[in-house]
Amino acid sequence: MNLQGNPLSAGAGTLRAGGFTWAYATSPTPLSRDYLIRIEMACDASPRVFVDDPDIGLLAGGRDLPHIYRNPTRLCLYLPGTREWQPWLRLDQTIVPWTSLWLFYFEDWLESGEWKGGGMHPGEASRTRQGRRRLGIRRPDECEIGNEE
């Protein structure tokens, strides 16, 4: 992983027993606000991505946030269990750009009220990875909204 060397994710991190935390500032477009992002990675676990600033719940103005996990609030960037993300994949080439894409669609949702980033919502029939491939759909941000991955 080359988080420091990638201009999209240049920031600072903390290494600890069993994992690390990485924080960086990003903006999905030149006209967008800046976001402070934190990635937490633990051994044998999927990365967890948080927006530390600004408060996306406050930005939503009381509306339910789309495509997040709760407790604690973190971004849903891909559909767990489909192997769209694997521990051997580089965070700077997967999670970082997927986070920018999520933020792009989030800002659009703030204005339009419609989530255009794709993905799965609770209650929808689960699509398999093979089914999505057969349909030509490969979205990094597909997820089911829930408490845990």
Predicted regions and their residues:
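Compact alpha/beta protein-protein interaction domains typified by the UBC
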Residues: T14-P80, L89-R90
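Charge-rich, low-complexity N-terminal segments
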Residues: M1-T21
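Domain-scale recognition of soluble eukaryotic interaction modules
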Residues: D53-E149
